[in-house]
């Protein structure tokens, strides 16, 4: 895939507003296609997402962000799609997270508390060594959880429920961002395993 600079010069430059918005929609479709490919495999076996596919998703994300900046330079304002506005707000609010609750099969397995300089994780009522807050927040930012859907089920992918694992992630903020709840049964966001790896150390 081309660099951001090449994309801006060779693809973006000279396009009108309508063309740029259409380009953004095309990139979002490509991102969704890649994510769904990973998520379908995760239903059968939860694994870390392949690096090459993650890299492509990141590139499409960069193209979308640059396209929105280009719209702003042309128009002075951006007509955000609802899901994109939520994604932006979630990403900007990551430094203001105060707690994350994570559970599987309705058991409170993990509570993550954000102190001034560190993150305290309690798993099954046992506290693990604290983690540097800046490191943890940067890792959360890389997950782009604001792009996740609110609910994931096997039915989303044309499969019957396997009656397996249900999970829940609840994110609390100390700014004006509302509490966000993600849930799933037998299905997961494409980088869910990366999230689990982060909180398990």
Language-model segment annotations:
Residues 41-106, 117, 124-135, 140-201:
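Short, well-ordered, aromatic-rich surface patches in folded extracellular/luminal domains
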Residues 1-30:
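Short, charge/polar-rich alpha-helical segments
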Residues 110-115, 119:
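Conserved beta-hairpin
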Residues 11, 31-34, 38-45:
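Secondary-structure edge/capping motif, primarily at the C-terminal ends of alpha-helices
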Residues 8-11, 112-113, 144-147:
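Short, solvent-exposed coil/turn linker segments
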């Amino acid at each position: 895939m081309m660099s951001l600079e090449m994309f801006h010069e060779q693809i973006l430059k000279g396009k009108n507003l309508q063309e740029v918005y259409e380009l953004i929609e095309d990139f979002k479709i490509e991102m969704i296609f890649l994510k769904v490919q990973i998520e379908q495999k995760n239903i059968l076996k939860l694994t870390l997402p392949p690096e090459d596919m993650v890299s492509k998703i990141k590139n499409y994300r960069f193209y979308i962000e640059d396209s929105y900046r280009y719209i702003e330079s042309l128009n002075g304002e951006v007509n955000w799609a609802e899901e994109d506005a939520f994604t932006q707000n979630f990403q900007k609010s990551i430094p203001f997270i105060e707690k994350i609750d994570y559970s599987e099969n309705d058991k409170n397995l993990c509570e993550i508390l954000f102190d001034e300089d560190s993150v305290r994780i309690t798993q099954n009522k046992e506290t693990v060594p604290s983690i540097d807050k800046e490191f943890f927040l940067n890792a959360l930012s890389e997950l782009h959880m604001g792009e996740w859907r609110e609910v994931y089920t096997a039915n989303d992918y044309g499969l019957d429920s396997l009656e397996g694992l249900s999970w829940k992630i609840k994110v609390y903020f100390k700014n004006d961002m509302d509490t966000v709840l993600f849930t799933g049964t037998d299905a997961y966001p494409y980088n869910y395993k990366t999230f689990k790896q982060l909180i398990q150390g």
